[in-house]
Amino acid sequence: MSPASPTFFCIGLCVLQVIQTQSGPLPKPSLQAQPSSLVPLGQSVILRCQGPPDVDLYRLEKLKPEKYEDQDFLFIPTMERSNAGRYRCSYQNGSHWSLPSDQLELIATGVYAKPSLSAHPSSAVPQGRDVTLKCQSPYSFDEFVLYKEGDTGSYKRPEKWYRANFPIITVTAAHSGTYRCYSFSSSSPYLWSAPSDPLVLVVTGLSATPSQVPTEESFPVTESSRRPSILPTNKISTTEKPMNITASPEGLSPPFGFAHQHYAKGNLVRICLGATIIIILLGLLAEDWHSRKKCLQHRMRALQRPLPPLPLA
C-alpha cells in the first residue's frame, strides 16, 4: 500500500461523517405568539418562528384553510375571526427542510359575551374544605375553560346546559388566587367568549396576599393544555405542570437546543478539517521520506557496484 492510501482513506471517512451529520433531519423550530395566543378581537399579535442561526428560508403557515408566508414572523394588526386557528412553521437550509414546529392555537376572545364565575358555598374557604367554581354562560356552549393567575395550564371541562362546575377538593394554600373562565362551542374551538370577571378565592386561616387581577396575556394556551385534565376525581390541581408553552413575553432568547446542535456540528466540521490537514501533511512527509530513502538506496547501490576492468594496453 502506498503512503498516500491511508491519507485518502481517512479523508474519505472524515468527509462521509461530515455529510452524514449535515444531511440528518433538521431540528424543528419553535412558534410563539407575542404577547399571547389569547387575542381579543381588534387587538394585534405577532407570530414568530425561531430556529437555529443562518437559516436560508422560513415558512409560516396556517392550517385549514391552508395558506403560508415565506418569512419568520406574521404580524396581525387587527385580530379577526378569520385569523383564529392552528399555525405551524418550518425552515430550509440548503435543499433540506426541517421538521414542522409544534402547532400553535391562536384563539380569538371576545367573540361572545362573557360568562359569570362564582364560588360555592363561598369564595372564602377554610383550609381543608371543598369548594366548587361555577362558570355559567348566557349561551348553550358545551366547552368551558378555567384559568388561575400564575398557572401556565388551564382546566377544561366539556359540559352542557350553559354552565360547568370545577370542584376543588380539600382546599390548600396553593388554591388561593384569582380565577376567570371562558366559554365556547366545540364546533368553533378557536372562537371564545370574553373572559369572566375575576374571582378571588381566599383560603382562610392563612396569611396569604391575594394576587393581582390577571390579564389575558398571563394565560398562554397550548393544544395540550386545552385538553381535559386527566384527574380521577375531576378536581383542580395547582401542582400540575404543562408540557408545552407556546405564548411567551417579548424578547425571549432562542431555544438552547438549536444553538447547541449548531455549535456541535460546527465543532465536528472543524475537527474533521483539522484532522484532514494533519493527515495530509503526515502523508506528504512520509511520501517525501520514502522518495529520499529510495534515492539514497539507488546511490548506495551505484557506489557498491564494481568498477569495469581497465582496458589492456
From Swiss-Prot:
The chain crosses the membrane at residues 266-286. Residues 287-313 are cytoplasmic. Its main location: membrane. GO terms for biological process: collagen-activated signaling pathway; collagen-activated tyrosine kinase receptor signaling pathway; platelet aggregation. Gene3D superfamilies: Immunoglobulins. Megakaryocytes and platelets. It is a single-pass membrane protein. It comes from the Eukaryota. It holds the Pfam family Ig_2. Disulfide bonds join 49-89, 135-181. Disruption phenotype: Mice deficient in Gp6 show a complete protection against arterial thrombosis and induced pulmonary thromboembolism, without significant prolongation of bleeding time. Mutant mice deficient in Gp6 and P3h2 are born at the expected Mendelian rate and have no visible phenotype. Residues 22-265 are extracellular. It is found in: Cell membrane. Residues 213-236 are annotated as: Disordered. Residues 27-105, 115-197 form the Ig-like C2-type domain. One of its GO terms (cellular component) is plasma membrane. Glycans are attached at residues 93, 244. One of its GO terms (molecular function) is collagen receptor activity. Residues 1-21 form the signal peptide. Collagen receptor involved in collagen-induced platelet adhesion and activation. Plays a key role in platelet procoagulant activity and subsequent thrombin and fibrin formation. This procoagulant function may contribute to arterial and venous thrombus formation. The signaling pathway involves the FcR gamma-chain, the Src kinases (likely FYN or LYN) and SYK, the adapter protein LAT and leads to the activation of PLCG2. Associated with Fc receptor gamma chain. The GPVI:FcRgamma complex is associated with the Src kinase family FYN and LYN. Interacts with TRAF4. Interacts with COL1A1, but not with COL4A4. PANTHER family: MHC CLASS I NK CELL RECEPTOR (PTHR11738), PLATELET GLYCOPROTEIN VI (PTHR11738:SF185). This is Platelet glycoprotein VI. It comes from Mus musculus (Mouse). The lineage of its organism: Eukaryota, Metazoa, Chordata, Craniata, Vertebrata. The gene is Gp6.
